[in-house]
Amino acid sequence: MNLKAITLMQFDSNGRLRHLLTLEGLSRHTLLQLLDCAAQNCALGVDPMGKRNVLAGMAVCTLFFEPSTRTRHSFHLAAQRLGADVLNFDASMSSTSKGESACDTLKNLEAMGVRGFIVRHPEEIVIAQLAAVVGEGTVLINAGAGRSTHPTQGLLDMLTLCQAKGNDFSKLKLLFVGDIKHSRVARSNLHALRTLGAGQIRVCGPTALLPHDGLLSGCVVSQDFDAMLEGVDVLMMLRLQRERMEEGLVPSLEHYHANYGLTAARLARAAPDAVVLHPGPINRGVEITDEVADGPQSWILRQASNGVMVRMAVLETLLG
């Protein structure tokens, strides 16, 4: 199933957003609505009294078939703050370890009354398969599918950019560095940035870690990190997705850090007010140094806190 078909599966017969499966194909208006709702959540703070009953009495399930820290727990917190009952699915302790399919798992939980499924899976096609079998009134949210899509990460990164640089992206110079080929975060970010009218998007990484499927069309692409830094407003550092890549694509971690690691010296070559983002988990000393990750230009922890607010916005938009 292609991405266009998956995009269309997100909408009901009236054209309203029913699921969140990918940012590709979402309108600027829809993206801005979700970001505006998330910004309102930020203004309310970590204890939004007025929203405690938005999902009261509703059961949602975090259905994760891959490890997660930030995404899983921020979705859990988001659903709790909206008053939902949250089930945390552990694949290793479930009947999937006995051969049950993801679709059968979802349908059984749906039969028990779960109305919202937040799903992470290593295979891209599974998200589409689940969307095809859920019943009317049940919502599916993609929390990361293989190396193709991670829509809520894309949204929280856009919110963080708005906070750091304002709502007009047209003059921004953004630089993505690292393993773009295997990064679902990069893909979702690039789709969102194009829809929101980003200025110049630069992409840098080893040739073996750059995609050749048209994703980088319109981007400035180079293998020379140092040459790409001048005037950059935003640096998005991406980890090596070693669980998804073939052996030998990178000679060594030391070699990678020497060529693509963000150090304080390299950051000094970007714009003076440049900000650093990283979706996590961070591999310190590989793609980024401690000094930069913990420094004043790092917005990495803001990304983590924004994750809760964005995921609240998605849940209340689809289920509220």
Swiss-Prot record:
InterPro entries tied to this protein: Asp/Orn_carbamoyltranf_P-bd, Asp/Orn_carbamoylTrfase, Asp/Orn_carbamoylTrfase_sf, Asp_carbamoyltransf, Asp_carbamoyltransf_Asp/Orn-bd
Catalyzed reactions per annotation: carbamoyl phosphate + L-aspartate = N-carbamoyl-L-aspartate + phosphate + H(+)
Positions of carbamoyl phosphate binding: 70-71, 120, 150, 153, 280-281
One Pfam family this sequence matches: OTCace
Transferase in keyword set: yes
Binding, L-aspartate: 98, 184, 239
EC number: 2.1.3.2
A GO BP annotation: 'de novo' pyrimidine nucleobase biosynthetic process
Pathway annotation from the record: Pyrimidine metabolism; UMP biosynthesis via de novo pathway; (S)-dihydroorotate from bicarbonate: step 2/3
SUPFAM superfamilies in the cross-refs: Aspartate/ornithine carbamoyltransferase (SSF53671)
Keywords annotated in UniProt: Pyrimidine biosynthesis, Transferase
Keyword Transit peptide: no
GO CC list: cytosol
GO molecular function, one term: aspartate carbamoyltransferase activity
Its biological purpose: Catalyzes the condensation of carbamoyl phosphate and aspartate to form carbamoyl aspartate and inorganic phosphate, the committed step in the de novo pyrimidine nucleotide biosynthesis pathway.
The family this protein is said to belong to: Belongs to the aspartate/ornithine carbamoyltransferase superfamily. ATCase family.
Quaternary structure note: Heterododecamer (2C3:3R2) of six catalytic PyrB chains organized as two trimers (C3), and six regulatory PyrI chains organized as three dimers (R2).
Protein name as catalogued: Aspartate carbamoyltransferase catalytic subunit
